[in-house]
Amino acid sequence: AGKIYMGRTYHTPCEDIQISHCLMENGHGGVTAGSEMAGGVKHVRVSDCLMRNTDRGLRVKTRRGRGKDGVIDDIVFEHVKMEHVGAPFVVNCLYFCDPDGHTDWVQSREKQPVNDGTPYVGNVIFRDVEAEHCGACAGYFLGLPEQPIEHVVMEDVHFTFDSKAKPMQPAMAEGVEECLNRGVIAKFVNHITMKNVTVTGQQGDMLDCEQVAHVEGVEQQ
């Protein structure tokens, strides 16, 4: 869906996409959206897939400057199995791509003005997912302070960890620490819903929240 000038010129999102019965192996992400997504990415269904030895399962990347048409919404994973995936679910709104990617404006954890350059991440939904032998963490969700991720839903999702895994940085953004066998980490998210979610063998809390407005289904740590 392109960078901001392409999104403004063509107004053409990537949408109504079905990915099913696929094997993804040995890459940075099983299914990736962004970071060049100024036209938007919407209504994506990933089902009946196997992801093996990838750094991440779902990988969403965006950043300030991608534009108000850069909407990522209605991304659904269901009936998916993962084996030896470093971080099964990653949504990163502070991706440090492009020559200015490490600047204070892109990476600031302080609220910036919401303007024509501000992207939006809406609903990201995971149902019936088995992630075995995870490495870094179960999930890493990093929104923008001024435009948090709207809603993360996990239902019938189960994680186990690889005790022999090595630490990994789950999201490519300044200040993101290397993780090992962590649970779900969420920062700048409006709403998290978890139903029948298990995390087995993690270090620390199952859910580690910072600037998350509402949590349903698990006691916020």
Regions found by a protein language model. Name each.
Residues A1-Q221:
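Extracellular/periplasmic carbohydrate-active domains that bind, remodel
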